[in-house]
């Protein structure tokens, strides 16, 4: 059997994702589509609107054959580390291809640029540092430095282009046999916050925003299973998961933390801990808080990730230890259909990473220890006894079928 | 002017406390009654039902002339340290007497027993250790060891007797000129949980319990000002402060803490951190949680204090540094009437501790740093923008008149 990998967040799974899965299958004629999916928190440092289990169910219904977890130490990360983790898992699962959606739409410039980045790594790093020293934020500095070392075809200010570039770069660096592919995204702007009226495709950001107001508005932009899963979740748990819900916990935590302890938290650098401590006293919402902390130097995304690490109490030291090898240390399926199951059956005897269906066995793995803390922080907003039940779900849920 | 000191929690101020203030004034014929009052959390490790400012207002209306804060590092402590802190503040304020309520009711056995404890300190400590090693909890071990070194008149299993004993002992140890006095308590049982029907005096525990159900039931057991203050507080803040309200925060915190970090927390000893970590997963309420953690060795009170220290993130190291000298480092009035103001005016030029009316100036004091964290944890349960307002109150509230 032949497998293609995709890297996803499905926050939540919508018609654009459905299209991506269908196009991936068509373009690669793979037998099995494997999605590596962020767990409880996303790359941009936000709690996923519903837990990984619900999102995995949506993915299965949307045509994915196997959903595996991208654990927190890789998921809540810069694009570079996010890609390293995802590629290492797809590689461990013997995917022949990795197919990502991008603004650009053809693979050649990704390969060229990635090669340039790998072979002129030090030169590029040096340039990035120079720009950052000038007060330019990391994303911009990265693009400018890329231009300086001779690149001029790929627009890396586009969020999916930059992610795609990092997948290809990770493939090269990990000497993986995975062949990268790309398909053009049909949602023009990732950050769109209004729902389009003439189409049935909208960004996940706009869908999440509209879910806060009314479920009905989003029905046409998501497959039926997504709609139903979201409804059931809210009916059972009485909430979505969004930053505002976690704000009381973040505030409580920041208020009772010493500045020295904030400095230990992942991604905290250069005195931002003092800004955080000061702004939290007056902030009455997460949005207010981040607006007060924001400077030119820190992107909103970076600040959101820092807040996520504070919430989950994940330190620089822990993260560094966990991702030292730049690879995942286990593969954890969250959901699979018959095809997914058959594929796993076929490859598992050759796999060099443990295939984990019961998280209990991973208790002492540094990556899993972080993943577990993140799950525990994630369910903290649920009322009892739902919170306790959700906690036990992390250990007790076998991969969904 | 002549001042008498009392040590209180007023959680909340009730008719029994009113009687105590009146009797104290009568017995000592002091011009000024000074109450040292626990701040946000009590000696038994519970959040006070309303903030210190509200409780100070009740005290003033109940006849106290000056209310000063017993800061967290002394307030949330064993009886011994609680007494050391309180006596040091009353001593700094030149109180001539300290008058406490006790089950026993006459002062001689307190003085005798305290002297015994001071002069046979090492012998007593050694005996206590022996009993604790046998698995007996600290309170019992303390009483048994006291009996062993020759004491036989004071029943130290009574909570107010033991507190009183520690006041007298602290007076001796601190070589203070304060003269101790006691009056018999008229609430027979401190831990009573039902309201008496034939009287207008009930324990604070039973009053707190009944407040959860209905305000009306408690009206006859508290002065009018207490009743009104409680009503206004609940009307404004939509809540009382009790452990169950803080349980989501405690649970979140314990779940995301490493075992090593729990070991650093004040009063955590002998592997209790593993019991805490294990029990929290299944616990759906604070009461369930503590019941699951409880062993013979740990009293309920001790466990509650540990939970309070976890909630406020107060470590052994911080506490040790703060109370190294066994004395308070400042005197902070929370409320005063004209008599209280006149008294302060008279004594302040002779005081050796700073008199703090704006907490901002104490920012770098180790005791105040802990007090501040406790305030911040205490207000975390309030909805926004009330939480932010309450935080600013800590700095901005001048002593009430």
Curated annotation (Swiss-Prot), chains A, B:
This is tRNA(Met) cytidine acetate ligase. Belongs to the TmcAL family. It comes from Anoxybacillus flavithermus (strain DSM 21510 / WK1). HAMAP family: TmcAL. Its EC number is 6.3.4.-. One of its GO terms (molecular function) is ATP binding. ATP binds at residues 7-20, 101, 160, 185-186. NCBIfam families: PRK13670.1, PRK13671.1. Coiled coil: none annotated. Its main location: cytoplasm. It is found in: Cytoplasm.
